[in-house]
C-alpha cells in the first residue's frame, strides 16, 4: 500500500475543499451573517493539514487499484467530516451525527435531511448545503484530476474508476486527465445554461444558484420548506428537463460535441432511460389524474416527480406519499433503477438493470437449449464476461447491504415501509422515501445509530459500494 501517495492526495483534497468553502464565506459576508466566522475557521482547519500533507511529493508514485479505492473512500469521509464543521460552529445543527448526516447527504447528492425546516437557516449555510451537491455530483476526485500536476503509474485511471458511477469507465480521449476536463466542461456548460433559463423565469439569483447546484448534482436540497412546490410551472418545467439531462451518460453529450449525432442517438442506455421515464409518466398520470385540477397539471407534476426520482434528485412539487399504491410502487421501482451510468445520478443504473435482465433471459434460454452458445449484447457490442461478473457481484453486495441496513435500523421500531424506503432513499442517493420519510417529512426521527447506518449507505451508494467496503476488507491492508 502506497500510504505516502494516499496522504498526499488527501492533502490536496483538503486544500481544494478549503477553496470550495470560500464562495460560502463570501455569501455569508454579503448577507452580513454570523456564520461567516464558522466558514473562516473551517477553511483554516482544512488548510493546516492540507498544506502539511502536500509539501513534499511522494518518491514512490506507483498507484494500483486498491490505492485508488482506499484514497477515494478516505477522501470522501475526510471531506464529509470537515464539511460538517460549518453546520456545528454556526449553530445550525448542534448534534455532530446530524451534521455529518446532512453533509454526507449533500456530497453524495442524496438530499435526505434531518432538518424539519430550512427557511430559518442563514444564506451562507443554505448555499454551502446546496453547493455540496454540485461538488459531489461529478466527483471531487475527478475535479482534482483536472488540477493536480502529478504523474504516476495508474494514478489517474484508478482514481477515476473508483469514483465514477457505472459498471465501467470509458476514456473519452486517450489521456484520463483530459477526459476529466471534458467531463467538467460539459457539467459546467449545462449548469450555466440551466442557471440562465431559471433567471429568465424570474427566479431570484440566490434561489437559482441553489437550485442549479441541486439539479446538476441530482441532489435535492431545497431552500424552501416545501421543496419546489412554491415555484411557477415554468421553473418546475425547466428543472424537470434538466434533471433528465443530468441523468444521461455524459458520453452522449461528448459525442454531440464531437459532431457525431448518429453515434449519440444510438446510445442504447439513454433510449432505455428515456423510455422508462415516458412510460412511467403516462401510467402514473392515468392513476393520479383526479388528484389535480386538470390533466395538464397532473402530467406536469407527475413528469417532475418521475424525473426527480429516477435521476435520484429528490426535489418534490407535491406530496406523492398521498398518491395511490400503484403510482407509489412505480416510484419505488424507479428509485432502484436510477439514472444512466456516467451521469451524476444514483441508483443501480439503467445499464446494470438491462444487463441483469439480459443475463436472466440468457440463462432461461440455455436451460431450454443447453448446447446453445449465446452472447449478451449491449450498445451494439458483445459484453465481456468480466463486466457481467462485476454486475452480478455488485447486485449481490447491494442486496446484502440493503437487507442488513433495513434490519439494523429496525431497532428504532418504525414501520417496514418507512425503514425499507429510508434505506432505498439513502443507498440509491435519492432523498425522500415514503411514510415517515416522505417528501413532506425528514430523517430527524431516527436514532444516532440508525443515522450512522444510513450515512454509511449514502457513501456506499455514491461510491458504487466497493471502495467503501474495501476499507473493511483485511486483504486491502496486507503488504504484498
What residues fall within each predicted segment?
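Membrane-proximal intracellular helices of multi-pass ion channels
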Residues: 1-480
Amino acid at each position: 500500500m502506497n500510504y505516502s501517495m494516499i496522504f498526499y492526495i488527501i492533502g490536496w483534497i483538503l486544500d481544494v475543499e478549503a477553496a470550495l468553502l470560500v464562495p460560502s464565506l463570501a455569501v455569508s459576508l454579503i448577507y452580513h451573517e454570523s456564520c461567516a466566522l464558522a466558514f473562516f475557521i473551517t477553511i483554516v482547519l482544512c488548510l493546516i493539514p492540507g498544506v502539511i500533507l502536500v509539501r513534499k511529493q511522494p518518491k514512490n508514485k506507483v498507484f494500483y487499484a486498491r490505492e485508488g479505492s482506499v484514497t477515494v473512500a478516505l477522501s470522501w469521509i475526510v471531506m464529509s467530516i470537515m464539511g460538517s464543521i460549518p453546520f456545528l460552529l454556526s449553530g445550525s445543527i448542534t448534534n455532530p451525527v446530524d451534521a455529518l448526516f446532512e453533509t454526507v447527504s449533500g456530497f453524495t447528492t442524496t438530499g435526505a435531511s434531518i432538518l424539519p425546516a430550512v427557511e430559518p437557516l442563514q444564506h451562507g449555510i443554505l448555499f454551502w448545503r446546496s453547493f455540496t451537491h454540485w461538488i459531489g455530483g461529478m466527483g471531487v476526485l475527478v475535479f482534482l484530476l483536472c488540477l493536480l500536476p502529478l504523474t504516476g503509474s495508474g494514478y489517474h485511471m484508478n482514481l477515476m474508476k473508483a469514483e465514477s458511477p457505472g459498471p465501467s469507465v470509458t476514456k473519452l480521449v486517450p489521456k484520463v486527465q483530459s477526459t476529466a476536463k471534458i467531463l467538467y466542461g460539459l457539467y459546467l456548460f449545462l449548469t450555466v445554461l440551466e442557471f440562465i433559463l431559471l433567471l429568465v423565469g424570474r427566479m431570484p439569483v440566490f434561489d437559482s444558484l441553489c437550485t442549479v447546484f441541486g439539479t446538476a448534482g441530482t441532489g435535492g436540497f431545497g431552500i424552501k420548506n416545501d421543496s419546489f412546490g412554491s415555484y411557477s410551472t415554468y421553473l418546475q418545467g425547466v428543472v424537470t428537463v434538466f434533471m433528465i439531462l443530468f441523468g444521461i451518460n455524459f458520453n452522449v453529450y461528448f459525442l454531440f460535441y464531437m459532431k457525431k449525432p448518429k453515434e449519440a442517438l444510438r446510445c442504447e442506455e439513454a433510449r432505455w432511460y428515456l423510455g422508462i421515464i415516458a412510460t412511467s409518466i403516462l401510467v402514473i398520470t392515468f392513476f393520479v389524474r383526479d388528484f389535480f385540477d386538470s390533466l395538464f397539471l397532473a402530467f406536469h407534476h407527475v413528469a417532475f416527480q418521475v424525473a426527480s426520482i429516477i435521476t435520484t434528485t429528490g426535489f418534490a412539487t407535491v406530496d406523492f406519499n398521498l398518491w395511490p399504491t400503484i403510482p407509489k410502487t412505480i416510484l419505488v421501482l424507479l428509485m432502484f433503477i436510477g439514472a444512466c451510468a456516467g451521469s451524476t445520478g444514483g441508483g443501480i443504473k439503467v445499464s446494470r438493470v438491462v444487463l441483469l435482465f439480459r443475463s436472466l433471459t440468457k440463462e432461461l434460454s440455455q436451460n431450454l437449449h443447453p448446447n446453445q452458445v449465446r452472447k449478451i449484447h449491449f450498445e451494439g457490442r458483445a459484453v465481456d464476461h468480466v463486466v457481467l461478473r462485476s454486475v452480478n457481484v455488485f447486485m449481490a453486495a447491494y442486496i446484502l447491504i440493503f437487507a442488513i441496513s433495513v434490519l439494523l435500523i429496525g431497532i428504532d421500531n418504525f414501520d417496514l415501509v418507512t425503514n425499507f424506503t429510508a434505506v432505498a432513499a439513502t443507498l440509491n442517493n435519492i432523498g425522500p422515501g415514503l411514510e415517515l420519510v416522505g417528501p413532506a417529512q425528514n430523517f430527524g426521527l431516527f436514532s444516532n445509530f440508525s443515522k450512522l447506518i444510513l450515512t454509511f449507505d449514502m457513501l456506499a451508494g455514491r461510491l458504487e459500494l466497493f471502495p467503501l467496503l474495501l476499507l473493511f476488507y483485511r486483504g486491502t491492508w496486507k503488504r504484498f
